[in-house]
Swiss-Prot record:
InterPro entries: PSI_PsaA (IPR006243), PSI_PsaA/B (IPR001280), PSI_PsaA/B_CS (IPR020586), PSI_PsaA/B_sf (IPR036408). [4Fe-4S] cluster binds at residues 573, 582. It is a multi-pass membrane protein. Keywords: 4Fe-4S, Chlorophyll, Chloroplast, Chromophore, Electron transport, Iron, Iron-sulfur, Magnesium, Membrane, Metal-binding, Oxidoreductase, Photosynthesis, Photosystem I, Plastid, Thylakoid, Transmembrane, Transmembrane helix, Transport. The keyword Nucleotide-binding does not apply. Phylloquinone binds at residue 692. This is Photosystem I P700 chlorophyll a apoprotein A1. Signal peptide: none annotated. The gene is psaA.
Amino acid sequence: MIIRSPEPEVKILVDRDPVKTSFEEWARPGHFSRTIAKGPDTTTWIWNLHADAHDFDSHTSDLEEISRKVFSAHFGQLSIIFLWLSGMYFHGARFSNYEAWLSDPTHIGPSAQVVWPIVGQEILNGDVGGGFRGIQITSGFFQIWRASGITSELQLYCTAIGALVFAALMLFAGWFHYHKAAPKLAWFQDVESMLNHHLAGLLGLGSLSWAGHQVHVSLPINQFLNAGVDPKEIPLPHEFILNRDLLAQLYPSFAEGATPFFTLNWSKYADFLTFRGGLDPVTGGLWLTDIAHHHLAIAILFLIAGHMYRTNWGIGHGLKDILEAHKGPFTGQGHKGLYEILTTSWHAQLSLNLAMLGSLTIVVAHHMYSMPPYPYLATDYGTQLSLFTHHMWIGGFLIVGAAAHAAIFMVRDYDPTTRYNDLLDRVLRHRDAIISHLNWACIFLGFHSFGLYIHNDTMSALGRPQDMFSDTAIQLQPVFAQWIQNTHALAPGATAPGATASTSLTWGGGDLVAVGGKVALLPIPLGTADFLVHHIHAFTIHVTVLILLKGVLFARSSRLIPDKANLGFRFPCDGPGRGGTCQVSAWDHVFLGLFWMYNAISVVIFHFSWKMQSDVWGSVSDQGVVTHITGGNFAQSSITINGWLRDFLWAQASQVIQSYGSSLSAYGLFFLGAHFVWAFSLMFLFSGRGYWQELIESIVWAHNKLKVAPATQPRALSIIQGRAVGVTHYLLGGIATTWAFFLARIIAVG
């Protein structure tokens, strides 16, 4: 008799054919909800359809089904992203001056859009240099393409087609994993496996393959481009990959192959994996050899991290154990119970991820200018300004989204009966202390930061410059920030003796880097003006946090409405006959938070735009004399409110206001139109629902009189719908106005 060890049971992780594919179902608007599927009685129907189409919680309470819908939707999202990327690459291939730009990136502007001559619109095709007429783009795609080693428009075509194939693949995957093989709930909740795959697969192998691409393709091609070789003469990527001798001519260590790696003689590879610091003086970007080295190191770290968590083999960390082992002196049972929250509430999980990703996006915004990663990015001022602004806005929206989903978690997924005395419960029990302290901090910051400006405006108006807070009178130097700058400027000598420069030129100490007579980067001086505006940043950020955090902590109950949880995430008032309870829902806090997020980000991008034009960007003469775009006026002008209005907003708006009849005229029209969109929002924000319902009823009366009344009854927007339309147009109008103002200005003077 043969004794066999018991066969390990294979877990079945998917359900086959759980939901049948039905085009009839898809074609029926509102098929996900019994009420909406009946069709419209009133115009409110179309709003409810939009509000609930993606609110999977409202379709079903089955967590597995919700998880599958979210998972499937992610593939749809990826499909759209690939489609968009394909379009970008196609524009580069078909409508751009990429090859011309590649041959002379300092004198030719990037353009990938040529306007057709319909009713005179061809005026928008400005001269970007090299005899090409088109719209100047500020997305940074040209710089990324050069860094990846793309040398021809044919390569862009091929990539665009590849992205289309991937878009189709993702669309198929979204259908397949919902209708054909849908994962079980246990699969979605297997966090250790998910961590291993995401860390080792996405981040580890992703970074490794990018490092490999850089070493074998980007570095040699960029080496040739920097030396002024014609792109058409440079060997193609596959020649570098297949022919080691080609690479060995540029990087001698390639001749030795993998021997140094296995004999641990790694320093041999220092010719293409460097640790220099600072910027490449030819391109004004980070050294690409530094970037390749960085991605290799990151890949190793994440490949190790992707083998740390316990899955099939019973070794490694369990996330639940790690969380529950965390106990501070004041936190009682510590993180006990958090694991269950994060594996059963996707809103809680999403909230954390949005907060982290939002913060990371803002970190990216600040690194794109201080450590410009791509060749010729630093001297393309329009792109620099656009990338900073874009990443700041995105980060702001993601962080507000984090608060929104935290509040939805509190209302829909939080179970107070099982959550006694865990960390979240302890936070909720002293929420009054948290919010009142935060409120005090906001009042303090608001009065003091604004007060410093008001003082300066008053002294300036009275003709008493010696009594102002400024670098030339009463100094308020940002000493801590200056200390951090100096520490980082001096750091390489002590901590990285092999590096030739510090991580960023902005820290100070180093010389400036100029490319083609334009400043790429130089040490950024900080003074009283920065100290003042920094405290406005502190103020606006704290108010945003106050509003959002109050919305989360009081989402389920408050002294005013103890049973708020029963009213849901969004409600206009606590019923008729209970005055003073309107606009207190968690949704309303997100609504208000969006306005303060807009304030906060606006001040940041204004600060950045003016500071860079005043103290960094400009031209360099043959003698090495730097002339900044606004001649260093930030330090003395931005210390009064009047200075911001006169020397920044008004002075720099001249380009967009006077753009008519030039290739920048579209920005003038957008500037005007976006102001209108913004003003349109006020109509929704300042007037009540009753006004519109009354107006509608008299219009309906006229229609009935003429016997042209529709079957669907018109209804005024609900209070919440009105506020949603209002905030959307407020933000859209404000952001588009700022975009037009920034770009018309920087394309004209940069």
